[in-house]
Structure formats: structure tokens, C-alpha cells
């Protein structure tokens, strides 16, 4: 789950 910083997936 990529948010406005970089939380993936």
C-alpha cells in the first residue's frame, strides 16, 4: 500500500 511517502505494498 504505497502512500505519499513509501509504505508498500
UniProtKB/Swiss-Prot annotation:
Disulfide topology: 2-8
Main location class: secreted
Tissues of expression: Expressed by the venom duct.
GO cellular-component term (any): extracellular region
Compartments, as annotated in UniProt: Secreted
Comment text on domains: The cysteine framework is C-C.
Protein name as annotated: Conopeptide-pc
Amino acid at each position: 500500500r504505497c502512500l505519499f511517502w513509501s509504505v508498500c505494498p
